Amino acid sequence: MPQTDTAELVVLLDDDGRTIGSAPKAQVHHASTPLHLAFSCYLFDDAGRVLLTRRAVHKRTFPGIWTNTCCGHPAPGEALQDAVTRRVREELGVGITDLRCVLPDFRYRAVAADGVVENEVCPVFCGRAVGQVHPDRDEVADHVWVPWQHMRAAAEFGWAISPWAAEQVPLLDAAGIGHRD
């Protein structure tokens, strides 16, 4: 069962990426969001397509926007790979194989139209989805499998996907991820 915003803690970081504490997720996403630990995940199918998701419209940060497969926060003391596996299962109902961290040092800051700020050290993972997608509608409004070149095109426009995905896609391209197209 997914944690609620009131129960979920995020790991706070200093500017060097060291853990300095934790805080309730519901209290850290605002105009002065402190630096905290997160992750992004891109899942591919056997045809090499990537799973895009549309964030639920009631989410606190970047509601209703199309983005990479899954994002989330590890709990204090939770290994990042375990957090990725947990959140993908909770949000999308699928398992993962071949999970690997491909951009371990990714960091970004993005300001939403409503002034809410994301400020994260956000390692990026890629893997293969196992099973049929059954999204939790409290987290995911929609989903679609697309060829990588469609993800690349969305990133080039910037406004078509989340700001973090728009930054991550060229880095993933440079790392050779998604080049089956």
Curated annotation (Swiss-Prot):
Question: What's the Enzyme Commission number for this chain?
Answer: 5.3.3.2
GO biological processes: dimethylallyl diphosphate biosynthetic process; isoprenoid biosynthetic process
Predominant localisation class: cytoplasm
Classification via SUPFAM superfamilies: Nudix
- Would the keyword Isomerase be found if you checked this record's keyword annotation? yes
State the active site.
Answer: 71, 120
Which positions are annotated as binding Mg(2+)? 91
The reactions it catalyses are: isopentenyl diphosphate = dimethylallyl diphosphate
A single GO cellular-component term on record = cytoplasm
Q: Where does Mn(2+) bind?
A: 29, 36, 73, 118, 120
Q: Which pathway features in its UniProt record?
A: Isoprenoid biosynthesis; dimethylallyl diphosphate biosynthesis; dimethylallyl diphosphate from isopentenyl diphosphate: step 1/1
Cofactor info, note text:
Binds 1 Mg(2+) ion per subunit. The magnesium ion binds only when substrate is bound.
The keyword DNA damage is assigned to this record:
no
Out of the domains of life, which is the source?
Answer: Bacteria
An example molecular function term from Gene Ontology annotations: isopentenyl-diphosphate delta-isomerase activity
Family per similarity comment: Belongs to the IPP isomerase type 1 family.
NCBIfam families attached to this UniProt entry = IPP_isom_1, PRK03759.1
Q: What HAMAP family does its record include?
A: Idi (MF_00202)
Free-text function comment from the UniProt entry: Catalyzes the 1,3-allylic rearrangement of the homoallylic substrate isopentenyl (IPP) to its highly electrophilic allylic isomer, dimethylallyl diphosphate (DMAPP).
Q: What's the protein here called?
A: Isopentenyl-diphosphate Delta-isomerase
Q: Which organism is it from?
A: Mycolicibacterium vanbaalenii (strain DSM 7251 / JCM 13017 / BCRC 16820 / KCTC 9966 / NRRL B-24157 / PYR-1)
Gene responsible for this protein: idi
